[in-house]
A protein has these predicted regions:
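Alpha-helical transmembrane segments of multi-pass membrane proteins predominantly involved
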Residues: 1-204
Length: 204
């Protein structure tokens, strides 16, 4: 039964990670990120107790909430995502398919290296890392770059949970996750402030 839930979580990760590549609305981005952390919880439960695994999803949801609240407080006209987000959905789907093929080929070897972490855990973590790196490669939006970094970190956390069960490490990774969200929120606000100041300087 646990293995079945793990593979369901892998499918959810595949859907959410591809969805993050395709959606343009920041609201859907935050929702998909939150669902992704829920699937991450299921995979981490394969190796960690519920208490420690819950720390991951709570930190992830808090990070998503930080980004969502920051973005909702900024004027929409400051973020022309159509101009900075590639329009080729077919290209992004093709790139995601290549990542999927690489993950399927690398999963058996990586699972063996990582103390037999399990195919579901390994494939889910590699999917997140691969899709996160792909996300970073096709966008310059601060919000999406932050989401890409958080996705890569989530994949690393899943894989690392198979070989390390330290409470201190779990807390440290949760702090890093929150730090990424706070840094992304600060940069969003700072970039918006600089865009507001620039027209005033030109008018002078």
């Amino acid at each position: 039964m646990a293995i079945t839930f793990a593979w369901i979580a892998v499918v959810v990760i595949l859907v959410t990670s591809v969805g993050l590549l395709l959606v343009r609305d920041w609201r859907f981005t935050i929702i998909l990120l939150a669902v992704q952390y829920l699937a991450m919880l299921v995979l981490i439960l394969q190796h960690w107790p519920l208490g420690m695994a819950t720390v991951k999803v709570v930190a992830g949801w808090m990070s998503a909430a930080i980004l969502g609240m920051t973005r909702s407080g900024l004027p929409a006209q400051q973020f022309d995502e159509e101009s900075i987000w590639p329009r080729g959905r077919l290209f992004r789907l093709f790139a995601a398919g290549i990542v999927g093929l690489i993950v399927s080929a690398a999963t058996p070897g990586v699972s063996t290296i990582m103390a037999d972490a399990g195919f579901a855990v390994t494939s889910g973590s590699l999917l997140l890392i691969g899709m996160g790196l792909l996300h970073l490669g096709i966008t310059v939006s601060l919000l999406r770059v932050t989401v890409g970094l958080m996705t890569v970190l989530a994949g690393f956390e899943i894989l690392y949970s198979a070989v390390e069960g330290s409470v201190l490490v779990a807390a440290l990774l949760a702090i890093i996750n929150l730090g990424l969200a706070l840094a992304g929120s600060y940069l969003l606000i700072a970039s918006n402030s600089s865009e507001d100041v620039e027209p005033e300087v030109k008018s002078l």
